């Protein structure tokens, strides 16, 4: 699976959490209703204006690799102060918007609200400050909630340094055609969506 790391020439992908809103229309009355689901989804955006030759080569290489790898890739994030360690999440929590974790250094600040972590290639945002207790355990509130709950007796490794999320490009074939036809000076916006 291809791993998107900090690019050499291209701007980095902007990640944001979007509410999962679906609009339904009644076939009987014609009225519409919007439903917001409890779990938001990650969306990434890569915007390149007035593309240079170096950026174009890097973009073509990226799109070709994602296309070849079945349109699933990982995005690595940076710049967070989460304590380096190899903690694990214990299951089940009974509620998938927090993690019971062990393996931290005791009595340490672990993360701030807004830091990112990943659990089994699911990218999460820490929603409240986290501090470990005297035995190195901590409860981490996260968003979005876990897509795949932790089963009883199972554990999941938590990645705190350069966490990753699993994404795909909608309509990769059309994006690949567009990128292949691009020339120096062109503009493009590519959207990526969480894959789960």
Feature map (PLM): residue ranges:
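Extracellular/virion structural assembly segments
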Residues: 1-196
């Amino acid at each position: 699976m291809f791993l998107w790391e900090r690019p050499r020439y291209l701007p980095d992908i902007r990640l944001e959490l979007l509410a999962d809103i679906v609009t339904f229309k009644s076939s009987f009355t014609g009225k519409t209703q919007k439903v917001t689901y409890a779990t938001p989804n990650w969306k990434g955006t890569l915007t390149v204006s007035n593309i240079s030759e170096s950026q174009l080569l890097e973009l073509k290489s990226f799109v070709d690799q994602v296309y070849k790898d079945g349109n699933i890739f990982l995005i690595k994030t940076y710049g967070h102060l989460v304590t380096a360690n190899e903690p694990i999440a214990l299951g089940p929590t009974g509620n998938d918007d927090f993690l019971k974790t062990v393996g931290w250094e005791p009595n340490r600040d672990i993360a701030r609200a807004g830091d990112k972590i990943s659990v089994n290639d699911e990218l999460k945002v820490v929603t409240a400050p986290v501090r470990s207790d005297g035995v190195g355990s901590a409860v981490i509130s996260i968003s979005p909630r876990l897509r795949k709950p932790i089963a009883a007796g199972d554990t999941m490794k938590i990645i705190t340094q350069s966490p990753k999320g699993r994404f795909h490009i909608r309509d990769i074939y059309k994006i690949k055609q567009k990128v292949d036809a691009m020339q120096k000076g062109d503009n493009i916006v590519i959207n990526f969506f969480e894959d789960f």
